[in-house]
Amino acid sequence: MRPYQNVAGIVNLAFACELFIKCLLNMSGIEHKGHKIEKLWNEYKTVCENEASEIEASVMSRLVADFTFGEMLHNDSDVFYNYRYLYDPERLAEIRNNPLKPQFLRVFVFAIYQSLNEKLICPDGIV
């Protein structure tokens, strides 16, 4: 994929991931600022280890990957920042040196969404 293809979709996907994790953190009584997905997720894991592990397992069960969850998370941690400022030569160089595999973010966002949906829409488990 060329770095400029589907930039809006990639930025929105990364931003959704950030907002969903921040929502989980907020529901756990923690406020956090910043765009680094890895930092946000690790903060959530320290508070809700079991739920975070379930989400990670859900993500990995949907991916065929040669990398661990942590490696993929680390690789995609700055996607929002890098793609949002794509016109910046430094960001473009970063994207070229570290190409995105968007399937991880797609699956991660969906898994977090499912977790939030269970907590917010159907907290008692009855659908």
Regions found by a protein language model. Give the residues of each.
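Charged alpha-helical initiation segments
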Residues: 1-11, 24-28
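A short acidic (Asp/Glu
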Residues: 22-25, 37
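Long, charged low-complexity segments
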Residues: 29-127
